Amino acid sequence: MQLTALLALATLAIAAPAEPSEVAPRNVLTGPCSSGVTNSNPQCCGAGILGILYFDCETPDEVSSPINPLKTICAAEGLQAKCCTLGIAGLGVLCTDALPE
């Protein structure tokens, strides 16, 4: 019993970091879309159904920036700026409005 307790204590002492590590701040946004798993693909899309499926989606040819936001790039083509989870064959799946830059 004492050996088990001693081994558990030794394991915890070895596993504990010597110094507290610093977490560097990171930007969670990469352009008009979040950097998560969902809604991370910038798309210019046409009409949509219930915010789940959008038609006529295409990846913009230009890189968006604060000077030239995705909304402006898509509006020039008559489309809406969206952030989609998946873009396949002109369809945008699980899309939300793009964030302002």
Curated annotation (Swiss-Prot):
Keywords: Cell wall, Disulfide bond, Secreted, Signal
Induction, per UniProt: Expression is highly up-regulated in the presence of root and stem powder of Shanxin poplar, but also under carbon or nitrogen starvation.
Main location: secreted
Signal peptide: 1-15
Domain of life: Eukaryota
Disulphide bridges, residue numbers: C33-C83, C44-C74, C45-C57, C84-C95
InterPro entries linked: Cerato-ulmin_hydrophobin, Hydrophobin_sf
The keyword Cytoplasm is annotated on this UniProt entry: no
Record Gene3D superfamilies: Hydrophobin
Any one Gene Ontology cellular component term annotated for this protein: extracellular region
Subcellular location: Secreted; Secreted, Cell wall
Coiled-coil ranges from the UniProt annotation: none
Described function: Aerial growth, conidiation, and dispersal of filamentous fungi in the environment rely upon a capability of their secreting small amphipathic proteins called hydrophobins (HPBs) with low sequence identity. Class I can self-assemble into an outermost layer of rodlet bundles on aerial cell surfaces, conferring cellular hydrophobicity that supports fungal growth, development and dispersal; whereas Class II form highly ordered films at water-air interfaces through intermolecular interactions but contribute nothing to the rodlet structure.
Similarity section: Belongs to the cerato-ulmin hydrophobin family.
Assembly description: Homodimer. Homodimers further self-assemble to form highly ordered films at water-air interfaces through intermolecular interactions.
Protein name (record): Class II hydrophobin 5
